[in-house]
Swiss-Prot record:
It comes from the Eukaryota. Changing K32A: Increase in inhibition potency of rat alpha-7/CHRNA7 nAChR. Does not show activity on human alpha-7/CHRNA7 nAChR. The modification Cysteine amide is found at C37. Keywords: Acetylcholine receptor inhibiting toxin, Amidation, Disulfide bond, Neurotoxin, Postsynaptic neurotoxin, Secreted, Toxin. Negative results: does not affect the following neuronal AChR: alpha-6/alpha-3 beta-4 (CHRNA6/CHRNA3 CHRNB4), rat alpha-7 (CHRNA7), alpha-9 alpha-10 (CHRNA9 CHRNA10), alpha-2 beta-2 (CHRNA2 CHRNB2), alpha-2 beta-4 (CHRNA2 CHRNB4), alpha-3 beta-2 (CHRNA3 CHRNB2), alpha-3 beta-4 (CHRNA3 CHRNB4), alpha-4 beta-2 (CHRNA4 CHRNB2), alpha-4 beta-4 (CHRNA4 CHRNB4), nor the muscle receptor alpha-1 beta-1 delta epsilon (CHRNA1 CHRNB1 CHRNE CHRND). Residues 25-27 are annotated as: Ser-Xaa-Pro motif, crucial for potent interaction with nAChR. Disulfide bonds join C23-C29, C24-C37. The keyword Zinc-finger does not apply. GO terms for molecular function: acetylcholine receptor inhibitor activity; toxin activity. Expressed by the venom duct. Residues 1-20, 39-41 form a propeptide. The cysteine framework is I (CC-C-C). Alpha4/7 pattern. This is Alpha-conotoxin TxIB. It comes from Conus textile (Cloth-of-gold cone).
Length: 41
């Protein structure tokens, strides 16, 4: 199960990489999606 979840998460992360970068540089969006931006500062 872990292997499958990792590969699925990696694909989703790759697809979202560009929009997430824009979101993570936008404080309101980053606050709504802390998990996308690493969560930890």
């Amino acid at each position: 199960f872990d292997g499958r979840n990792t590969s699925a998460n990696n694909k989703a992360t790759d697809l979202m990489a560009l929009p997430v970068r824009g979101c993570c540089s936008d404080p309101p969006c980053r606050n709504k999606h802390p998990d996308l931006c690493g969560g930890r500062r």
